[in-house]
Amino acid sequence: VLGGASILIRIPGHTLFYSGDISCTRQLLLAGCAHPDEVSHVDTLIIESTQGATDDDGRCDYEEETHRLGSAMRRVLKRGGSVLLPSFALGRTQEMVNIVANLQMSGEIPFVPMYTVGLGRAVYEIYDKFSSYLHPGGALRPLSSTQRLGNVWDKSVVDALLRKPC
């Protein structure tokens, strides 16, 4: 998570390490976490994590999954359908927008409008403001390239959206 931080606290006879939500896997926008070398011995470890109990060995390769997503999106869009990618507002939305943008730019999927809403869009603005902290190779797609959807609870907004591929 952009802005995630950790702290190592040493008191006589005890060492505590606290970390916010982390991912050690390199992503498109963020490098994987890197903890300082001096964290070799910790008595108490506290980690805030969305998927802390998952086994990294069971995960698929990032590039492979990106291409699988592109393939699935291409099939849906070819049939004239729309693709909905619900994601967490903090971190995941920003990553997904950029994955889709890269798939479009590489020609794996056609250019269709992308929409972002709510908190995911607001967090994207923060990523844009602090883009110097992002992974150097992870070029953040300008937020202006995505469109505002409006009130997603208004049926007419959703109906209008789904009339053409997006």
Annotate each PLM feature.
Residues 1-95, 99-108, 113:
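His/Asp/Glu-rich metal-coordinating catalytic cores
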